[in-house]
Amino acid sequence: AELPQGLWVRPRLG
């Protein structure tokens, strides 16, 4: 998981 687990999932949820 090299991607920011808070940048690609945050905007998706709101």
UniProtKB/Swiss-Prot annotation:
Locations listed in the record: Secreted
Similarity section: Belongs to the pyrokinin family.
Modified residues (Glycine amide): 14
Biological role: Myoactive.
Annotated organism of origin: Pachyphasma brandbergense (Gladiator)
GO biological process: neuropeptide signaling pathway
One of the record's GO cellular component terms: extracellular region
UniProt entry keywords in alphabetical sequence: Amidation, Neuropeptide, Secreted
Name by which UniProt lists this protein: Pyrokinin-4
Major site of localization recorded for this protein: secreted
